[in-house]
Amino acid sequence: MKRTYQPSKLVRKRRHGFRARMATRNGRKIIAARRNHGRQRLSA
């Protein structure tokens, strides 16, 4: 059986990257929430 996590840097960036987050309103809310929480890393 194939495992569910098949790492790919490109897919990771496209799905969870900063620009992907900024592209939608809800994504911007995620970035804002992580900024308010004081996260070192805002996105993948």
Swiss-Prot record:
GO MF term list: structural constituent of ribosome
Pfam families reported in the protein's UniProt record: Ribosomal_L34
NCBIfam families: rpmH_bact
Keywords annotated in UniProt: Ribonucleoprotein, Ribosomal protein
Biological processes, Gene Ontology terms: translation
Coiled coil location: none
KW Secreted (keyword) present: no
Protein name: Large ribosomal subunit protein bL34
GO CC terms of this entry: ribonucleoprotein complex; ribosome
Family: Belongs to the bacterial ribosomal protein bL34 family.
Entry-linked PROSITE patterns: RIBOSOMAL_L34
